[in-house]
């Protein structure tokens, strides 16, 4: 019988003992997928980026889309972990360590997608040797690296505090620094796109706060899915009131995100200029499926969050998954849509492997999807995601992430 959680109720007893053969099999599968993805990446390196479907008109693709998406997942998880400590309010039932470990795994994945997007990763050192500190790309490299280190330090500080070796004040200071960095990392990622004047769809001051709201949506949603799954597997016991609290928080963040989306659409469409073409592309053009999946999925998430009778565990998981999928669709719209809009008057452009007439090439770019990932890109993506799953499972098996009486 489905559990109704419209009001706070004691959590059910764990269905099974966590670990054992099932966990070992899951770790093995994740490791195999990771190795397979690594092999495909080596193939990509030996053959060059021509093996992908990224070209001059669409120089960023699936890898950078996943980078944006995973930065959001990581930032959102750390924010909901650190904010209760910083502001001295009740947390979510001792899930802070799990949320932070999830954030660390997502950050590693985000960095991994940047690496696989490099045609020559052995030249990574040149980013630091010849760095341009006036570039948002360099800002993001610095902030993302700092963020990963801070996340690890924050987890270490929580473990020390629970072991009686740290002070509450020190942990709160680390929490505050981590919270600021979590907001900053997603803002800087947004500025990579928002400060590009040549891309009309990206060039908006709204992009920074919009990215932060999206991070909160998918971060809370991911933590919801993880903790419900772990409770089901017997890893932790979590009172249902904390699940409901996170669901309500997710509903608020979803509404804020949809509000930002509506403001952006109205600002672009109302003058009836070139911005109207962007809105048409999103609502009825090549990107319409992603647009409507996001809007309808996030609306359904909000409805489940604010309707007590719908707060059953299966629907809570569905709401969280819809929110995650919706934010991913937004990332696809942003990145691919930015390249759909021609931004230069050129006598000719390189489209694919050959030289094409500018009019025909740009018409093709605007009339249909200018980019769709190759099977190789999907394979490499699966390998990187497999690495994240492997890290998450290993952490659950070997790290003391379960709640204790001192967690909150």
Features from the language model and the residues they span:
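Membrane helical hairpin/interfacial module
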Residues: 58-122, 139, 143
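Membrane-interface interhelical loops and short amphipathic "cap" helices
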Residues: 40-64, 116-138, 164-166, 190-211, ...
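Hydrophobic alpha-helical transmembrane segments
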Residues: 68-72, 139-152, 215, 286-299, ...
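Long, contiguous internal "core" modules enriched in hydrophobic/ aromatic residues
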Residues: 13-34, 89-91, 129, 133, ...
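N-terminal signal-anchor module of multipass membrane proteins
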Residues: 1-76, 80, 389-393, 406
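TerminUS-proximal long segments
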Residues: 3, 314-408
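Juxtamembrane membrane-interface segments at transmembrane alpha-helix termini
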Residues: 109-110, 136-140, 328-337
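Alpha-helical transmembrane segments
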Residues: 39, 81, 154-155, 303-304, ...
